[in-house]
Amino acid sequence: VDPGESTFIDEGATGR
């Protein structure tokens, strides 16, 4: 899982 994916899982798209 790359940083964008973990933020996506965690915050619902903020890291995408």
Swiss-Prot record:
One of its GO terms (biological process) is blood coagulation. Keywords: Adaptive immunity, Blood coagulation, Coiled coil, Disulfide bond, Hemostasis, Immunity, Innate immunity, Secreted. Disulfide bonds: none annotated. It comes from the Eukaryota. It is found in: Secreted. Its main location: secreted. Cleaved by the protease thrombin to yield monomers which, together with fibrinogen beta (FGB) and fibrinogen gamma (FGG), polymerize to form an insoluble fibrin matrix. Fibrin has a major function in hemostasis as one of the primary components of blood clots. In addition, functions during the early stages of wound repair to stabilize the lesion and guide cell migration during re-epithelialization. Was originally thought to be essential for platelet aggregation, based on in vitro studies using anticoagulated blood. This is Fibrinogen alpha chain. The gene is FGA.
